[in-house]
C-alpha cells in the first residue's frame, strides 16, 4: 500500500530506498510534521515510487523537502533454510552469528525489518556459512499490520 510523506529534496528520487528512523527534535514545531512522520513506521525500509515537483521549506533538510509516494521495499535477506518457504509469513529473527566480518553478516542481520514479512521468492544462489549454518537467500516484502 502506498503512503504519502515528505523527504529531503536531494534524496527524493524515484527508486531510492530509506529506513525510517523517526522524527527529530527539530521536527516538533513544524507544520508538516504530521505528513512527514505519521504515515511511516519506525524501522521500516521504504522505496520511493513517485516524486511530486513542489518544494517545501524544512529546518532539517538544507534544500527543503518534496512530497513523495512510498511503499514498503522488497529486499533480500538471508535466513535459516528450514524457514525459507515461498509465500509464508514470518516474524524476523536474525541468524545466530557473531562474525561481523563475514560477507553475509549484513544480510543475516538486516536493518529495516520491523514486524512481519512475506517470503516472495527463494533465490537460487548458494549461501556459504563459515559457522556451518544451513542458510538461504530470500526476497521479502513487509506485511502491513
From Swiss-Prot:
InterPro entries: UPF0179. Transmembrane segments: none annotated. Pfam families: UPF0179 (PF03684). It comes from the Archaea. Belongs to the UPF0179 family. This is UPF0179 protein MmarC7_0952. It comes from Methanococcus maripaludis (strain C7 / ATCC BAA-1331).
Amino acid at each position: 500500500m502506498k503512503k504519502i510523506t515528505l523527504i529531503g529534496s536531494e534524496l527524493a528520487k524515484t527508486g531510492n530506498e530509506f529506513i525510517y528512523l523517526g522524527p527529530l527534535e527539530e521536527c516538533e514545531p513544524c507544520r508538516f510534521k504530521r505528513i512527514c512522520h505519521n504515515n511511516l513506521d519506525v524501522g521500516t525500509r521504504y522505496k520511493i515510487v513517485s516524486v511530486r515537483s513542489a518544494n517545501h521549506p524544512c529546518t532539517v533538510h538544507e534544500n527543503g523537502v518534496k512530497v513523495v509516494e512510498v511503499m514498503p521495499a522488497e529486499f533480500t535477506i538471508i535466513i535459516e533454510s528450514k524457514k525459507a518457504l515461498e509465500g509464508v509469513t514470518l516474524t524476523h529473527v536474525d541468524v545466530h552469528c557473531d562474525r561481523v566480518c563475514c560477507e553475509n553478516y549484513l544480510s543475516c542481520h538486516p536493518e529495516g525489518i520491523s514486524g512481519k514479512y512475506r517470503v516472495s521468492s527463494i533465490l537460487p544462489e548458494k549461501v556459504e556459512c563459515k559457522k556451518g549454518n544451513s542458510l538461504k537467500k530470500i526476497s521479502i516484502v513487509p506485511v502491513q499490520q
